[in-house]
């Protein structure tokens, strides 16, 4: 997984170009999850944000513009972090970026919003990640996550493209599985929506 995102950092970054109408039509989930992140951040007063798997900082830019006063982005791909550093430079000391695996990264304190967008697709150890997110989620805060679901149309295509050709495992989720994942990590309430046919958007709240 690390090798794929390191080698194709610019290619993944390009997927978020708003001007590319074809991307909006073929990958609407990319923009739905960004919208949910922005709405969540904008709904809080001066929130702090932890972005796990921040990639090139595309969503980070939007949540900082939406009012985040402190943003920590973590990604295990150094080329992704380099892109994020250039994109978020204008936000000065509101931003800190770390190139490291989240489970080993030196994260201190709690955050009002924890983002996990386009991350759980690739995690064989999802419960460990959810537990650490809970540990860094402030009381009253929430995790905002996106999760793929098996689709008879997109499922086989993704399996061939990522697993067979790209040597990059893909993990799918069910609504019941997501409830268990976040309840097991300690979250008190989980909101799950399925705006498209191939995945879920989640907000999991810490009491």
Q: Where would I find each of the regions flagged by the language model?
A:
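Short alpha-helix
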Residues: 169-185
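Short catalytic micro-motifs in class I SAM-dependent methyltransferases
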Residues: 118-119
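Conserved class I S-adenosyl-L-methionine
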Residues: 1-42
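Short, glycine-/aromatic-enriched active-site segment of Class I SAM-dependent methyltransferases
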Residues: 149-169
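A conserved beta-strand element that flanks and buttresses the S-adenosyl-L-methionine
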Residues: 115
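Class I SAM-dependent methyltransferase SAM/SAH-binding core
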Residues: 56-103
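Conserved beta-strand signature within the Rossmann-like core of class I S-adenosyl-L-methionine
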Residues: 141-147
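A short glycine-rich, Lys/Arg-flanked "PGG" loop and its adjoining helix->strand segment in the class I
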Residues: 127-139
